[in-house]
Amino acid sequence: MRRALRLLPLPLSIAICLPAMAADKPLNWGLCPAVDPLPGFDGAPAADPKAAEMRQQLPTDIEGDQLSGTSTTPQYQGNVALKRGDQFLGADNLRMDTETGNYIAEGNVRYQDTSFRMVADRAEGNQDTDTHKVTNIQYQLVERRGNGDAESVDLQGQVGQMHRSTYTTCDPSQPIWRVRAPEIDVDNEEGFGTARNAVLQIGKVPVLYFPWFKFPIDDRRQTGLLFPQFGLSGRNGFDYLQPIYLNLAPNYDATLLPRYMSKRGFMFGTEFRYLYEGGRGEVTGNYLPNDKLRDKDRGSVFYSGYHNVNTHWQARSSISWVSDTRYVEDFTSRLNGMGSASSLQSTVGIYGTGETWTAGLMADRWQLTDYTLDEQALPYNRQPRAYFTWEKPFGIFEAGVYAEAVRFTHDDSYFVQPPSPSAPGETNNRDDNDEYVRTNIRNKEYGSGARLDVKPYISMPLSGAAWFLTPTVAWRYTAYQLDSTLANTAPLTGNRTPSRSLPIASLDAGLYFDRETSLFGTNYLNTLEPRMYYLYVPYRDQDDLPVFDTRPFTFSYGQLFRDTRYTGADRQNDANQLTLAVTSRWLRQDDGREKLSLSAGQILYFSDSLVTINNSNNSAAGSEQTVEQGKSAWVADANYMINDRWSMGATYQWNPNSRKEDLASLRTRYLLNNDGIINLAYRYRRNLTDNSDQLKQADFSFLYPINPSWSAVGRYYYSLLDRKPLEIIGGVQWDSCCLAVRGLVRRFVRNRDGEMDNSIQIEFVLKGLSSFGQNTDRTLRRAILGYYRDDLYLVPPSNTTTNPDDYDPNLIP
């Protein structure tokens, strides 16, 4: 009797064929009815994945109210039930012929297993020839939403055919959308299905027609069309992208990406992915012949991949190339010049990690992507860079070393001629083709050089229940080998082998006090955590040292406890200074959550710090304010959790020398019901070199649920200095059990010149099937912090990154 259940997997195979194309995004099913369209059947076994895996080895039990016929032609009548593992088949009547293999199940035919549920009028077939037919089917997917019906299903072995079938994730009483197909062929052995004349309906209106397409019915990938993306923008006009997936092999595939932009023409793109036991990779290329707006060919290539050499070593590479300096602006929708980089980095290297060590050998190169700048804005290329770090405790001591050897190169710089200024009274009125012109006049010839930096240290971390004390001594040696071009570049003195050697001593100490207290009827644990950090570094003249990759750190609370002001090894500031800081927290005793935290600190400079980065050979390194004897700016951080929904934070820096604030930021967040959120922020920064205002911005964003189905989204990002918006977003979202529609209108700064662009984004999400239109998630997730509520709880990036290529030697010890 075990073979009597052979027909049952067929409806499952066909039912999952369309949802197999569903997107990977998390879906909200909260608006769906709590009751399944097909409730579970009485007497059916409970869902059990383990029983589903073993069903072929389990016996079949048959029961019914009455049994008649003969031993070769048994007939079961009334409440017939067949059970095997997690499978259940019920019917009013079941007739069988054990000699011919024929069977007929009639009246209220029901089937259920761990992932699938079905009702039908009749099922018949022959077990010997493995042919089956089921008529008038209604089905439901149990593990994920999805239901539909079919007029009939025919099965011959592993091949089946469904007639006049539908699929939707909507409630059957309100099918907002459904897919209809008069004929679907399914091959379980090959793992694909073929639909003919399929139509996607929204309501009763057909919106997409597929005369023929193949699709997967299991995890095996199949070649075919993916859902399109489309949008509208002032830069590109109507924008349509039709992905075509190519399943080339089990471990590699490709996607063709033809794209039409009404203002530019056809762009041809492709994406190739590969996977093997030791690694994976992905390469993407795009080519636009004869861009209508630029009158030239455009293109890009991006590659990323890795290979695991063994348990300690991994090779990684990331290659980026674009055809011109306008490409990023024209074909990305980020805040170019404001929130995106002016250059692309390509990196290749091998990296190792052990219990007490990290090491690596890599090389990188930079490409300019901002047409308003010349090559002077690019960082130096590292070709190559080798580094090694080691640290290990020895009793009460801890010892370690950081070593790095780098060869730096740089492309020569050529003058960029800006376009003619606008007429009086006009602003940014020039045509798109009136570009900056890159001349052949050399602006600066860069040489090359190599640098060795070694920093051994030894520390003695001591601590108790309410205190810690860590004295540290380090020695830093840095040496260069420069070519004549670089060595004779002002203000360098012509020395081709300059070097620097100096000790670094620090003492880090802190105390911890706490007490129990009560405020407004709530019990708190109040802490007081004073901290002291003394740093001494003798002065060394470093004017003859080039500046390759060194920049001043942005002054912050964390900077109070670093042993250098710089990110790289080209400068090591002299110091005789003491940091005094204190932190106080209020922790709720019932759950340990932090109600309020306050931190403040200041550096006391006992002497002038003579080392600066000013007037270096590298204009891109910028400049900094000299550090004089006295006091640094006060740095204060505060975070206040008003309640479980409302939080506030602030950062403030006040300079006692200028009696002005150097930096101020205020941010507040309110969490609404139904995952809504409101963000408000203000940011201010003063230019310390000329005391002018450098940045003054206000940022307001929200996701406001109007009701369970409708919500509004928006952002207003405004520059108070320029008196103009940087980005404006407005949109609405409509959500239902099975369909979501999002529409956005966006106006944003598209380049460093402050020119604005407009775009319209519309996306349809057929839950459980796919989405088409322009992806709005990426835009909203960037613009509205907390658009995905889980983003609020992600750990922010820190300087103690585990990526060895990003390891900062100045954070050792």
Swiss-Prot record:
Pfam families documented for this protein: LptD (PF04453), LptD_N (PF03968)
Principal location class: membrane
Keyword annotations: Cell outer membrane, Membrane, Signal
Cleaved signal peptide residues: 1-22
Gene Ontology, cellular component aspect: cell outer membrane; transporter complex
Entries under InterPro entries matching the protein: LipoPS_assembly_LptD, LptD, LptD_C, OstA-like_N
Cellular localization per UniProt: Cell outer membrane
GO biological process, one term: lipopolysaccharide transport
Source domain of life: Bacteria
Alphabetical list of HAMAP family matching this protein: LPS_assembly_LptD
Subunit comment: Component of the lipopolysaccharide transport and assembly complex. Interacts with LptE and LptA.
Protein name per Swiss-Prot or TrEMBL: LPS-assembly protein LptD
Organism: Xanthomonas axonopodis pv. citri (strain 306)
Lineage: Bacteria, Pseudomonadati, Pseudomonadota, Gammaproteobacteria, Lysobacterales
The encoding gene: lptD
